[in-house]
Amino acid sequence: MKYDVAVIGGGVVGALISRELSKYDVKAAVLERCNDIAMGTTKANSAIVHGGFDAVSGTVKAKLNVEGTAIMPKLCKELNVPYRNNGSLVVAFSEKEMEHVHLLYDRGIKNGVPELEIIDSKRLHELEPNISDEAVGALYSKSAGIVLSLIYI
């Protein structure tokens, strides 16, 4: 059989590419090296929909992280897949680690990440009451969330 497009990988990204290709008059084949879908990166992922603050500014990854996070709630609704916009935290346990939090914040702002803030220990404990008292602060990305990736595919 001949195909117009080969999609490499049957994880979340491959599934979304295949879904998009299904809107066009093309024959597509999904090539997966494992014996089932979602056995690679998707399986190892914690199902987080990243806010986009960690990718190097100016890269395609940075752009797609932010765009992907923005479309995920609508896409999950269309696919009837559970999605929770619970945000994400990068927690610091020292002032040295807070320097890294500030770096991630600056990068996130450059990347166009919405609802990104640096929070102090008090606010962190309001969000996560059981977190260690040694935590000094965090980067809080309100736009991040989680999705049930195996249902998603």
Task: State each model region's role.
Residues 11, 34, 47:
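Proline-glycine-enriched beta-turn/loop adjacent to the NAD(P) cofactor-binding site
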Residues 47-127, 136:
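Dinucleotide-binding Rossmann-like beta1-alpha1 core, especially the glycine-rich loop
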Residues 152-153:
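Conserved small/polar residues in nucleotide/adenosyl-binding loops
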Residues 3-30:
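N-terminal Rossmann-like FAD-binding beta1-loop-alpha1 element of flavoenzymes
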Residues 133:
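The feature captures the short pre-catalytic strand/loop hairpin that immediately precedes
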Residues 141-147:
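Glycine-rich "substrate-gating" loop/helix at the edge of Rossmann-like oxidoreductase active sites
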Residues 22-44:
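Glycine-rich FAD pyrophosphate-binding loop
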